Swiss-Prot record:
Record's protein name: Ribosome maturation factor RimM
Function field: An accessory protein needed during the final step in the assembly of 30S ribosomal subunit, possibly for assembly of the head region. Essential for efficient processing of 16S rRNA. May be needed both before and after RbfA during the maturation of 16S rRNA. It has affinity for free ribosomal 30S subunits but not for 70S ribosomes.
The keyword Glycoprotein is annotated on this UniProt entry: no
UniProt record similarity statement: Belongs to the RimM family.
Source organism (scientific name): Porphyromonas gingivalis (strain ATCC BAA-308 / W83)
InterPro entries recorded: PRC_barrel-like_sf, PRC_RimM, RimM, RimM_N, RimM_N_sf, Transl_B-barrel_sf
Pfam families, per database record: PRC_RimM, RimM
GO MF: ribosome binding
Disulfide-bond pairs as recorded: none
All residue ranges annotated as the PRC barrel domain in the record: 99-172
Length: 175
């Protein structure tokens, strides 16, 4: 039996869109390539603290941060309304591929290590309001640390273990 610990949280279902059972969703992962590659892709709704599989049959982007999803067996706006606000998950095995791109928000809750393997802290928030994206990290001492993040500073992203290994410029941890 699949439990929530074996799944990756990828977003929340929003309100229904239209009359045929589609819904808005804010996702932290871009599933477009995976949706095209997989013959049958299942996403999981968290219902009564249990993961319930639903087959994804429709996927299209509405705006930069809103995706429209359609699931088998949900044929109307009324049927979809009961799932508004439900957390959405998918199997972690899909995250071992290069078919998924993430938003920075997806990394909230990940642990951060420097390139020597020393624990830096846990990501609590992401600030994308500046030119450089900043990770808000709580250190083991309870101190808040803001780290700029760019692809050249990311040494390893381990999604299944929710871990980032970063190249942290000298002196940044002492600020």
């Amino acid at each position: 039996m699949i439990d929530l610990d074996s799944l990756e949280h990828i977003g929340v279902l929003g309100k229904p869109h239209g009359v045929q059972g589609e819904c808005n969703a804010r996702l932290t992962a871009d599933l477009s390539t995976l949706f095209e590659e997989e013959e049958r892709l299942f996403l999981f709704f968290e219902l009564d603290a249990l993961p319930v599989p639903f087959r994804l049959i429709g996927y299209r982007e509405k705006t930069d941060d809103i995706t429209l999803l359609r699931f088998a067996g949900i044929e109307s706006k009324e049927e979809m309304e009961q799932y508004t606000g439900v957390s959405l998950f998918m199997e972690r095995r899909y995250f071992d591929t290069d078919s998924i791109e993430f938003t920075w928000e997806h990394f909230i809750g990940f642990t951060v290590f420097d390139r020597e393997g020393c624990f830096v802290g846990t990501i609590d928030d992401v600030d994308e309001s500046t030119l450089n994206v900043l990770l808000s990290i709580t250190t083991p001492e309870g101190k808040e640390l803001l780290l700029p993040v760019a692809e050249d500073l990311l040494e390893e992203i381990d999604v299944p273990n929710r871990k980032l290994t970063m190249i942290i410029p000298d002196g940044l941890l002492q600020l």
